[in-house]
Design a protein with these regions (language model features):
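PLP-dependent enzyme catalytic core of the Aspartate aminotransferase-like
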Residues: 330-352
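PLP-dependent aminotransferase-like
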Residues: 77-143
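Conserved PLP-binding catalytic core of the aspartate aminotransferase-like
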Residues: 281-311
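A glycine-/small-polar-enriched, mobile loop at the entrance of the PLP active site in fold-type I
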Residues: 2-53
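Active-site C-terminal subdomain of aminotransferase-like
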Residues: 14, 191-272, 286
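Conserved active-site segment immediately N-terminal to the catalytic lysine
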Residues: 167, 180-192
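Active-site phosphate-binding strand-loop segment of PLP-dependent enzymes
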Residues: 9, 110, 121-174
Length: 352
């Protein structure tokens, strides 16, 4: 039976990427060696790292604009701490938008290092919307936001305007839509949504913003050290970086971010259309802030829930259960999710 994987992450990856990756685990580059047993400093893997870095900057339209791409470890969760370590000055202040669980966690970590001003929060309505009316302080070192909220199904459609540094956690929607990525001074994203398997974390940073905090930074948390060592200060996550390279090449061959955005819009509009037109379902997030990556919805007649769950199971649908803090259902429709799988879900909703 064909499976339809709506998991929030780790999540679906392109089938051709999985095939290439599995072959490389057995015999990488016709070396008669596995990808996961070669030296990370071999010419073959150095070429992988360089190609992956170049693909990131090309797909985000950040080539020759002063940015570099890093592949680190510790997930986006470690970036919650690395970001203030590298950007928050001694006795400085940063501003944060609180739009969900992950932004709340980033705030908690940043407060360990300095004065953090939470300038707006949607916690009053269980994070089901994106705050819009807030004032950005002038005396901050940076402003931090989270572009997409996997748990609650909200997504920022526009971003704050500030004369200070702008930082964005794009873990769950990077490479999914066309935006001006140059408005950000630092972007970070865990790989396990639109890039590859868990194990590496992408950081895209403007190099000239670093080294200005006046604080001592542990080596493993210092972006400048990782830049100087080409993301190899310690042994990199060889397999996740390689799969990320394959996924980004797949995206480039597809036509890049502009092409995948059209596909993503079609998938989301198909599913949201059914949610809005079917009285048995209702969306969990404010309509104007709905995520095109994580579609959260509720069933309005609980007497039909067990039947719907069984229908999904019989159809090979996986990973549809909503997060415990929201309940209901969450269909994660990342870049690699085919629209045919979304149609299978919509057909079930219509037949309930």
């Amino acid at each position: 039976m064909k499976k339809h994987n709506f998991s929030a992450g780790p999540c679906i990856l392109p089938q051709e990427v999985l095939k290439q990756a599995s072959e490389a685990v057995i015999n990488f580059n016709n070396l008669d060696l596995s990808l996961i047993e070669i030296s990370h400093r071999s010419a073959d893997f150095v070429a992988v790292m360089e190609k992956t870095r170049n693909l990131v900057l090309e797909l985000l339209d950040l080539e020759n604009k002063g940015y570099t791409a890093l592949f680190l470890q510790g997930g986006a969760s470690l970036e919650f701490l690395m970001c203030p370590y590298n950007l928050l000055k001694e006795n400085g202040k940063a501003a944060y938008l609180d739009t969900g669980t992950w932004s709340s966690k980033s705030i908690k970590e940043a407060k360990l290092l300095g004065d953090i001003d939470v300038i707006a929060s949607s916690q009053d309505k269980n994070f089901n919307y994106i705050p819009k009316d807030y004032k950005i302080p002038e005396d901050i070192n940076y402003l931090h936001c989270t572009s997409n909220n996997t748990i609650y199904g909200t997504q920022m459609k526009s971003f704050p305007k500030t004369d200070n540094l702008l930082v964005c956690d794009m873990s769950s929607d990077i490479f999914s839509r066309v935006i001006d990525f140059s408005q950000f001074d630092l972007i970070y994203a865990g790989a396990q949504k639109n890039m590859g398997p868990a194990g590496t974390t992408l950081v895209v940073v403007k190099k000239d913003i670093l080294g200005k905090t006046g604080r001592k930074i542990p080596s493993m948390l210092d972006y400048q050290i990782h830049i100087a060592k080409d993301s190899m200060y310690n042994t990199p996550a060889v397999f996740p970086v390689y799969v990320t390279m394959l996924t980004l090449q797949w995206l480039k061959d597809l036509g890049g971010v502009a092409a995948i955005e059209k596909i993503n819009n079609a998938k989301a509009e198909l599913l949201y259309g059914e949610i809005d037109n079917n009285p048995l379902f209702e969306g969990a997030a404010a309509k104007e802030d709905r995520s095109y990556m994580n579609v959260t919805f509720l069933i309005t007649d609980n007497s039909k829930k067990d039947r719907f769950d069984q229908m999904c199971k019989d159809a090979g649908i996986n990973g549809l259960k909503g997060h415990r803090s929201v309940g209901g259902y969450r269909a994660s429709i990342y870049n690699a999710m085919p629209i045919e799988s979304v149609q299978v879900l919509v057909d079930l909703m219509q037949n309930l």
